From Swiss-Prot:
Binds to 23S rRNA. Forms part of two intersubunit bridges in the 70S ribosome. One of its GO terms (cellular component) is cytosolic large ribosomal subunit. GO terms for biological process: translation. This is Large ribosomal subunit protein uL14. Signal peptide: none annotated. It comes from Pseudoalteromonas atlantica (strain T6c / ATCC BAA-1087).
Amino acid sequence: MIQMQTNLDVADNSGARRVQCIKVLGGSHRRYAHIGDIIKVTVKEAIPRGKVKKGDVLTAVVVRTRKGVRRSDGSSIRFDNNAAVLLNANKQPIGTRIFGPVTRELRVNNMKIVSLAPEVL
């Protein structure tokens, strides 16, 4: 569950290392974002010569949460960190590589991220 002020790791090679959620998109008073949801983030930590720099405001999709996700068969998957992938204005990933596993729930709206990921759970 990601809410405003939550710090997330960045799971791609866009140049950002840590981002902070500043808005959960998808409703006027929506409080939490889960895996697959779109959020507005600001870059808090970035590497030199990356595609993004500190202070940039971008959209991102949540790919891993510590809360995890429950499946219809009763199983649940949790991760050790909260992570997001940064998106451009066309809702396509800024980076060309994805680090770490992602869940099958991303297949519905983010097939590009699933195809770049090294492991899909």
